[in-house]
């Protein structure tokens, strides 16, 4: 009898296999009722744990923003509606990451895979579209500074919200409606069950929106520099003060756009060039920074906002600190 220690076809420990030798046959099979099948050990991918933890942090942060905007009647301006849309999208994205972890290890089925990927695609798409809508709102509020705050602006904001959530929902429904690779693995992208074509459309759409945001922020920088120069002339500020204020505004815009690109660009480019045959570690390594964007968004767009800070202080302690009530708005607050 030739025994190969490298092959274990039964899936049982080695001492159970050795019990099947002739000298141990009586001990190996005492009776039919005493045979116990061993259950396969559940192995959890550390990357999935990190993604689930990231989703939990995303949910906690953005839930606070959603509650603040919903609870405060004063936060009903178009800007806060768009910030609320961004927070809601990121909240759903974090929830999707948590559900994906639960379904992947407890309720594995084709239906749960499609529902989870649909939720994640729709929520992250809504998040990116909300960022673009916020950029458009900032540009228009500076370009039409005297006439932007009107009923017409509110209507335009609602139209943008309906369009971005409608488009994002359609993108999320594509895998559920049949555009997936569950039946043909050769068409899979780096994120199963998304097809390669589906991932390419999402990536190209992101690059288009990033280019549009870049162009808008360049125009915003020009407007901020012009406004800061006019304010300096009217109030007889020193050139140094004008330079510092303008530099702060441009630095803020560079931080916003740079963070967005650093988080999403690696996964976007990787989705275009890679497919399901590539090692999954590359997918995790590029997808994880994309989730960090939803962690950073509340800090950049919500918690830095003076009105949201006031509302948060009112909810938590019932008062507004003097530093917030006396702070003047400057051109760097864009």
Swiss-Prot record:
GO molecular function: G protein-coupled receptor activity; phosphatidylcholine binding
GO cellular component, one term: plasma membrane
Domain of life, source organism: Eukaryota
Extracellular side: 1-48, 100-113, 180-199, 274-282
Compartments, as annotated in UniProt: Cell membrane
Major site of localization recorded for this protein: membrane
Transmembrane segments: 49-69, 79-99, 114-134, 159-179, 200-220, 253-273, 283-303
Stretches in topological domain Cytoplasmic: 70-78, 135-158, 221-252, 304-334
Any one Pfam family match given in the protein's UniProt record, by short name: 7tm_1
Tagged with keyword Phosphoprotein: yes
Modified residues (Phosphoserine): 330, 332
Membrane topology reported for the UniProt record: Multi-pass membrane protein
Glycan-bearing residues: 8, 24
Organ and tissue specificity: Expressed in the brain, pituitary gland and testis.
An example Gene Ontology biological process: intracellular calcium ion homeostasis
Family annotation (InterPro entries): GPCR_Rhodpsn, GPCR_Rhodpsn_7TM, GPR12, GPR_3/6/12_orphan
Lipidation (S-palmitoyl cysteine): 317
Key words of the record: Cell membrane, G-protein coupled receptor, Glycoprotein, Lipoprotein, Membrane, Palmitate, Phosphoprotein, Receptor, Transducer, Transmembrane, Transmembrane helix
PROSITE patterns, per database record: G_PROTEIN_RECEP_F1_1 (PS00237), G_PROTEIN_RECEP_F1_2 (PS50262)
Function recorded in the entry: Receptor with constitutive G(s) signaling activity that activates cyclic AMP. Promotes neurite outgrowth and blocks myelin inhibition in neurons.
The family this protein is said to belong to: Belongs to the G-protein coupled receptor 1 family.
The protein's name in its UniProt record: G-protein coupled receptor 12
Provenance organism: Rattus norvegicus (Rat)
Taxonomic lineage: Eukaryota, Metazoa, Chordata, Craniata, Vertebrata
């Amino acid at each position: 009898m030739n025994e190969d220690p490298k092959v274990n076809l039964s899936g049982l420990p080695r001492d159970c296999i050795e019990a099947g030798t002739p000298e141990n046959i009586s001990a190996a099979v005492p009776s039919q009722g005493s045979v116990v099948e061993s259950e396969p050990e559940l192995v959890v991918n550390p990357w999935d744990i990190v993604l689930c933890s990231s989703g939990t942090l995303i949910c906690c942060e953005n839930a606070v923003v959603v509650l603040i905007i919903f609870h405060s009647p004063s936060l009903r301006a178009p800007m806060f509606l768009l910030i609320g849309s961004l927070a809601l999208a990121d909240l759903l994205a974090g929830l999707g990451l948590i559900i994906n972890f639960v379904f992947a290890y407890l309720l594995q089925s084709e239906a749960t895979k499609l529902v989870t990927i649909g939720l994640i695609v729709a929520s992250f798409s809504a998040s990116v579209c909300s960022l673009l809508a916020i950029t458009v709102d900032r540009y228009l509020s500076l370009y039409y500074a005297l006439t932007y705050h009107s009923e017409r602006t509110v209507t335009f904001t609602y139209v943008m919200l309906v369009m971005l959530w409608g488009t994002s929902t359609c993108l999320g429904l594509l895998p559920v409606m049949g555009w997936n690779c569950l039946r043909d693995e050769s068409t899979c992208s780096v994120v199963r069950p998304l097809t390669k074509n589906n991932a390419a459309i999402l990536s190209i759409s992101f690059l288009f929106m990033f280019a549009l945001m870049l162009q808008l922020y360049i125009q915003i920088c020009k407007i901020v520099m012009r406004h800061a120069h006019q304010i300096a002339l009217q109030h007889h500020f020193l050139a140094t003060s004008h330079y510092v204020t303008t530099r702060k505004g441009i630095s803020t815009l560079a931080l916003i756009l740079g963070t967005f690109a650093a988080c999403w660009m690696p996964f976007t480019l990787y989705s275009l060039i890679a497919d399901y045959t590539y090692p999954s570690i590359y997918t995790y390594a590029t997808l994880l920074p994309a989730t960090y964007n939803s962690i950073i968004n509340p800090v950049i767009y919500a918690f830095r906002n003076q009105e949201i800070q006031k509302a948060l202080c009112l909810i938590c302690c019932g008062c507004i600190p003097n530093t917030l009530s006396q702070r003047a708005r400057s051109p760097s607050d864009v």
